[in-house]
């Protein structure tokens, strides 16, 4: 039964997507924004809370705090014993998790619809009564250290993402990955964690988004019962205002490690999500890298056999993000040859208009991806919260696709010429160091 519920919530297509996704939204007096989407196609409900805090809200010397709290806030609360948080949801036949980005931290509980009250109680406990104390802090320090060792330090090409950020951002706090610095976490005192919690984990910095088999009026009553009494935060919520300079000249570096085959990474600065040019850039990256027939894969992997794999994706962020392009060189291929091949693909979208046939295929891919993002209750709840947080307009869940459809072939060429330039990029070579490999 448990596996069935989780599978339904995560994978079942949302039958009514062809119609608008209907929702209601309102604010509690304490500033908590609430979004409700009613859907009775399956007896499940996604109870989610998005806190508008990510690694960009951290200070130099105290990095990793946002991601650390993603772990710490499963430790328990004044009314939930240590290690008992997940058991409540699992015993009810549901699943729960959380994730942290540069811009937000997102918690979700996927439960049978008759357990809506349980999900609301658990999330209210996280917001009001979480245990931020030495025992949990020390426990999670070790958990996060092990995560860093597994995902970054001992993972092939594990430094790819952190190195891309630190080279691309010199002013903005996007310069570090959400995992942060273990030295910073070790240096943080208990009062640092308490202050972080009291600053960011407050109703006026959160969105409660619920999607699924609910009675909206009953849900509102339960929300009022569990959240209306939580005090509004009194601390000023810091938001970075620094703008990362762009087009300052190409940045090149070599990162030596134990990885056997050369990896090339290029990072191009792009506009913030939601701007007209962003949609053109995002479509370009889909053109270059989405699927086996995409340009990078077709030309550099299949035809020229320069790379074992090659791709690009949009690292879209609340503030201006990046296009990240990467290629793993085939055995015996000079990394400079692979870089030249990657650059040739970027140059082509600058010099040649995309054909009508390829453009129509691209539009179809964009539309399919948009539908897929909102094909589960959890996906709908997250999208509604994201659109409200980043744009102040949750209805973009229905209309953002129109912004993509307004992009023309000429817009693609113009965006490529503006953003895919050498002076606007970082180029990193990840090469094998025989001395490290032998140790």
Model-predicted segments: where are they?
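Non-catalytic, conformational "gating/processing" segments within enzyme and secreted inhibitor domains
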Residues: 141, 194-226, 423-424
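His/Glu-based metal-binding/catalytic segments typifying zinc-dependent metallopeptidases
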Residues: 149, 166, 235-293
């Amino acid at each position: 039964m448990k596996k069935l519920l989780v599978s339904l919530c995560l994978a079942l297509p949302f039958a009514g997507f062809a119609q608008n996704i209907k929702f209601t939204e309102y604010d509690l007096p304490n500033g908590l924004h609430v979004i409700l989407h009613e859907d009775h196609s399956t007896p499940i409900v996604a109870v989610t809370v998005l806190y508008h805090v990510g690694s960009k809200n951290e200070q130099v010397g105290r990095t990793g705090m946002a991601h650390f709290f993603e772990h710490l806030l499963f430790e328990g609360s004044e009314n939930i014993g240590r290690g008992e948080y997940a058991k409540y949801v699992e015993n009810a036949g549901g699943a729960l998790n959380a994730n942290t980005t540069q811009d937000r931290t997102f918690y979700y509980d996927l439960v049978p619809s008759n357990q809506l009250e349980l999900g609301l109680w658990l999330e209210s406990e996280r917001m009001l009564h979480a245990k931020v104390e030495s025992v949990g802090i020390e426990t999670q320090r070790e958990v996060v250290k092990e995560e860093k060792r597994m995902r970054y330090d001992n993972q092939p090409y594990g430094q790819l993402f952190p190195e891309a950020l630190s080279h691309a951002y010199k002013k903005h706090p996007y310069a570090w990955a959400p995992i942060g610095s273990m030295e910073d976490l070790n240096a943080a005192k208990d009062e640092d964690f308490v202050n972080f919690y009291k600053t960011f984990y407050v109703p006026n910095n959160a969105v409660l988004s619920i999607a699924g088999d609910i009675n909206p009026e009953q849900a509102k009553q339960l929300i009022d019962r569990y959240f209306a009494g939580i005090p509004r935060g009194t601390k000023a919520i810091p938001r970075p205002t620094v703008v990362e300079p762009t087009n300052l000249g190409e940045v090149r570096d070599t990162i030596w490690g134990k990885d056997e085959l050369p990896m090339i990474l290029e990072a191009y600065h792009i506009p913030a999500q939601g701007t007209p040019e962003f949609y053109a850039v995002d479509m370009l990256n889909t053109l270059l890298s989405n699927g086996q027939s995409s340009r990078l894969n077709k030309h550099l992997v299949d035809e020229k056999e320069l790379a074992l794999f090659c791709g690009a994706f949009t690292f879209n962020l609340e503030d201006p993000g990046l296009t990240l392009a990467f290629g793993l060189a085939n055995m015996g291929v000079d990394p400079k040859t692979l870089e030249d091949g990657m650059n040739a693909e970027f140059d082509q979208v600058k010099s040649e208009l995309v054909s009508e046939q390829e453009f129509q295929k691209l539009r179809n891919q964009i539309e399919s991806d948009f539908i897929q993002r909102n094909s589960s209750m959890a996906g709908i709840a997250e999208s509604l919260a994201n659109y409200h947080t980043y744009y102040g307009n949750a209805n973009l869940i229905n209309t953002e696709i129109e912004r993509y459809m307004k992009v023309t072939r000429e817009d693609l060429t113009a965006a490529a010429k503006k953003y895919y330039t050498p002076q606007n990029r970082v180029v990193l070579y990840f090469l094998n160091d025989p001395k490290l490999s032998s140790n």
